[in-house]
A protein has these predicted regions:
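Catalytic metal-binding/acid-base residues of hydrolase active sites
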Residues: 28, 64, 153-155, 189-192, ...
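Metal-dependent phosphoester-hydrolase catalytic domains
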Residues: 160, 164, 173-183, 191-272
Length: 272
């Protein structure tokens, strides 16, 4: 793939020592035949968005191995963890977590499947696809504070899979975070926030869109301009942070592309 033609002049993020900037980005699977919206046309704009926004961490949904490798190559200073959902290695979509090596240290990570057998590649309940969640224990280098980050993509068909997948994530959070460190959960949840499947999540975590001092209520699924304007199905949840000053749906064009995916990326700044 060709290198990016133009990148923002400054690649190093300037951040307050207690801030974490996170992005959730359903990148749209790279094998989809979307005409001029296919990956072959929009891949430079995806990298441009990351380098422009300069997050400390970001989570991808629907990313194939070659998309992950492309962003690692062209988003200077970022490294990722995650596995393909089909085989636990490279095949299928990755729920990758990227981190900025200048601001963030990776301590440990893992992936589990949203199924009755979460420790091996498997499809759960009434799901149409294998579904996973990737988690990481990270350390903010500026403040020295540790936190957990979970990135996921719930099923687009099965309501039981969404309900039970959500419960499994909540249960796993308790297991992997016994000390109650700050926690961030991002993803494409394939349902709106008024669904009862979110009830347990609402009790334990805050929704950045609703809590931020500066926010918006823009749709997150755009369907290449054809989606319902109320399609808010991507979320950033958090707990253990003192505040969320900014939440934003990233709708600005990059490299003259109105859409860099069929979902808009979303971002939030969280303060310890």
């Amino acid at each position: 793939m060709a290198a990016l033609m133009i990148l923002p002049a400054s690649m190093s993020a300037r951040k307050k020592s207690s801030d974490i900037k996170v992005i959730s980005y359903n990148i749209r699977l790279g094998v989809a035949k979307d005409g001029t919206n296919s990956w072959e046309y929009r891949y430079p704009a995806s990298a441009m968005m990351i380098m422009d926004q300069k997050p400390d961490i970001f989570g991808l949904q629907e990313a194939y191995d070659f998309q992950v490798k492309y962003l690692e190559e062209y988003c200077e200073g970022y490294k990722s963890v995650g596995v393909g959902r089909e085989d636990g290695k490279h095949e299928g979509e990755h729920m990758s977590i990227f981190y900025n090596k200048k601001t963030t240290k990776l301590l440990k990570w893992g992936t589990f499947w949203l199924s009755e057998t979460p420790d091996k590649p498997s499809m759960g309940w009434d799901a149409a696809c294998f579904r996973t969640a990737t988690w990481a224990l990270l350390k903010d280098k500026a403040s020295g504070k540790k936190y957990y980050y979970v990135n996921t993509h719930l099923d687009h068909v099965g309501w039981e899979a969404r309900k039970n997948g959500m419960k499994l994530i909540v249960d796993r959070i308790d297991n992997i975070n016994p000390k109650g460190l700050p926690m961030i959960v991002t993803g494409d949840f394939n349902m709106t926030y008024d669904r009862p499947e979110f009830d347990d999540r609402k009790k334990m975590m805050k929704n950045a869109r609703e809590e931020a001092a500066k926010t918006d209520h823009h749709q997150t699924f755009n369907g290449w301009g054809k989606a319902n304007p109320n399609s808010i199905i991507d979320f950033i949840f958090y707990k253990g942070f003192s505040s969320c000053p900014v939440y934003e749906t990233i709708t600005k064009p990059y490299m003259e592309r109105k859409f860099i995916s069929d979902h808009y990326p979303i971002t939030a700044t969280l303060v310890f």
